[in-house]
Amino acid sequence: MAGGATPGRAVVLETGRLLLRPWRVAEAVVQRELWTERDPRVPPHRRIDADGHPTVADLEESIRANRPSSIGLLAVERKAARDVIGYCGLIDSGRGPEGEPEMAFELLRRVWRQGYATEASLAVLDWARSSGYERLWATVWEWNTDSRRVLAKVGFDEAERKEVDAVYGTTLFTARRL
């Protein structure tokens, strides 16, 4: 199936501890913090550049420009603290088969190893299944053992496909049937 995406309809997901929802402009500072925390092994186009971009203003504009939809990276908010700690969701990165979006997540370092990535990922998987997707996939750097562990916990299996980059390392492709 091409997915249960309903154009123009925002997705909001809830778990015991989390709310996954569209980003708000004021939360661009959280996105900027994610950019600043990225591992130096991540390619430059996904890190802050020499001129300091993306800036908070750049990210605010990006949030304004992105209309809520049924596919995208949702802000992950802790319900008890009412703070945004990262993102999780589905993207169409163009690297996978038609109708099979990629699941992606990234959380602030200060909340790692508390089960939030697993909890958010399971909510996205449940939503994807109920929306009619049959399979999802995810990419992960071979050196990113924490994210590989989360993907394994939620049922993703590493595929034979890999992309090797002599500078940044190997990207592993994982998939999960729903």
Predicted segment positions?
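GNAT-family acyltransferases
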Residues: 1-110, 122-127, 131, 157-178
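Short alpha-helical segment within the catalytic ATP-binding CA
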Residues: 106, 119, 146
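Conserved GNAT acetyl-CoA-binding A-motif
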Residues: 131-139
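Glycine-rich acyl-CoA binding loop
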Residues: 113-118
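Conserved beta-strand-loop-alpha-helix junction that forms the acyl-donor binding cleft
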Residues: 138-148
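Conserved active-site tyrosine of GNAT-family acetyltransferases
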Residues: 151
